[in-house]
Amino acid sequence: MHFVIAYDIEKDHCRNKVMSALKDVGLRVQYSVFECDLDPRRLKELKARLSALINRRTDRLHIYPLCDACYFRSESLGLESRDLEA
């Protein structure tokens, strides 16, 4: 299943660890937004990993599931995702 994962992490070192964890499984489409294609097992593992990295009092992390129809109808305007890593 497809997911959009967005985060707002207060501390740089925590933000970098979250970003690294998400780069392992997804495509960075904005500086704090990733698209991931995950089966239920990998999603559960990722949620556990991310939960251990964030501070629940100061940080936010949202996981939005996307059905296939919605995912394939999505559009991008402006810079393509690959330009973020340049």
What are these regions (language model features)?
Residues 1-33, 37-42:
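Extended, hydrophobic alpha-helical segments
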Residues 35-59:
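Short, intrinsically disordered low-complexity segments
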Residues 52-86:
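C-terminal structural segments of small proteins and small subunits
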